[in-house]
Amino acid sequence: RQMCIRDRIHSASNFVVGMAGAKAAIALGIKSIYEIRGFWHLTQSTKRIGYEKSDHYTLSERLEIETAKMSDHVFTITSALRDILIQEGVHEDKISVLPNAVDPKKFTIKKKDKNLEKQLNFKDKVVIGYIGSFVKYEGLDILLEACSLLHTKIGDMFRLLLVGDGDTMTTLRDATRLLQLEDIVTFTGRVNHDEVNKYYSLIDIAPLPRKGLRVCELVSPLKPFEAMASGKVLVTSSVKALAEIVEDGETGLVFEKDNPKDLANKLESVILDKSLRDTIGKNARKWVVENHSWDLVSKKVI
């Protein structure tokens, strides 16, 4: 029988998996790597009122830190998450940032789908678009408020395309009616996976208005990298996990988190200036291709 020799165990969050991997590595006398893609308890705190004050939340955080300390090396998804580990006593020399990335061959600058553009009556409009889950921490209510301010100021120059579904859908639809934005906002609901690219092609500006919650400060989604690779103008809130991705004014725009007025101002600047939109979109794609393809990021692990 041929035996396959392993020299390390690589485990991904959360601590339930990571601690098992670290202990197994110790028992076998080999190295362990713990990859922290997020803190489960932080996500739960956005869904369960009062959870962040519970013993389970406190224990989960402590066990995440202990797992990182036990492991020989730790990868974190953001610099902000790395900084938290260092503050909690994990030695900085054994932590590397392993960020999200994108396949730049899959996400490219595409021509707009003219049939869908006509169907949605988006012709000659600048399209602000979000594709993803409708959950509280994404801040889509802030986006609606910003679009209301924007519409009052610049009129009928843009449309807001919201593709997806989730817990806040009803609240967002109600807010749209209350703000009298029915002619501006299009809700598609959930769409088939093979149709997503058609909707994505219509988007000029991709806002990520995540709220100033701890989970948003520490964890980055895939969405910003996909938007940048596609040549969209990324407009993110100033939460650390997103702001560290963008060079403000060059590869995207950053607005003050939880501030719809500042978001409206940033959106206005790129709606009114096509040249600026084009420049930022091209810069964003170039930066992602040169720094955040999966091929490049995976070499840090290998």
List each model region and its residues.
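Acidic donor-binding loop of glycosyltransferase active sites
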Residues: 6, 72, 184, 200-217, ...
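A short, well-ordered alpha-helix in the C-terminal region of glycosyltransferases
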Residues: 125, 184, 262, 269, ...
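Nucleotide-activated donor-binding/catalytic signature segment of Leloir-type glycosyltransferases, i.e.
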Residues: 154, 163, 170-195
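Carbohydrate-associated surface elements
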Residues: 80, 101
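Short hydrophobic beta-strand element within catalytic cores of glycosyltransferases
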Residues: 33, 205-208, 226-229, 233-236, ...
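Conserved donor-binding/catalytic core segment of Leloir-type glycosyltransferases
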Residues: 122-147, 161
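Short, small-residue-biased leader/transition segments that mark boundaries at the very start
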Residues: 1-5
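Conserved acidic donor-binding segment of nucleotide-sugar-dependent glycosyltransferases
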Residues: 248-249, 253-260, 269-275
